[in-house]
């Protein structure tokens, strides 16, 4: 669990208030045909859900476009989703340089090879995509970002998103955004490899 996840209640299942069951969700969508263009399937990590493939297929079958947010931890599920034809756009989070990935996601023995595999799956899928990194102090340094970018030198879109404390963090605190100068340096380092990289919100 990433300590900077801003959806702690979703991740820990500690507060289900305000949620919709599946029947209510699809009733909501049926009423909004012709009004909404698409649905973003996010989380937590949506590829953890055992029924994610059927869920996405139902949304697509109703005529909506589908965007998938993922951290790439489950490449086999990701591959099936992208091969299904039910995903129109995928956004994958890159958490950090490989040496500090486990620390960043809160799993000491995390297998970074799964992330690398997911990167390749997305690249070859034919589905439109972006990569992004939430930039968090003290987990990231500006000097990290050239190395992160080297994982995805082919990416048409890569965004740095400065951390914002939602008040609902997994970690409980101690994390901050990168300062303006440090964030600018992070972007400069990223653009050595991906010249079109941007800071989210400054497009």
List the model feature ranges, each with a label.
Residues 44:
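Short, charge-patterned binding micro-sites
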Residues 1-20:
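Canonical Radical SAM [4Fe-4S] cluster-binding loop centered on the CxxxCxxC motif
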Residues 15, 69, 132, 199-202:
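Residue-level detector of family-conserved "landmark" positions at structurally sensitive sites
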Residues 26-38, 47-182:
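Conserved AdoMet/S-adenosylmethionine-binding subsite of the radical SAM
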Residues 6, 24-25, 77, 186:
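Hydrophobic alpha-helical segments typical of transmembrane helices
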Residues 17-24, 30:
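N-terminal pre-catalytic segment of deacetylase/amide-hydrolase enzymes
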Residues 184-203:
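A C-terminal junction/extension of Radical SAM enzymes
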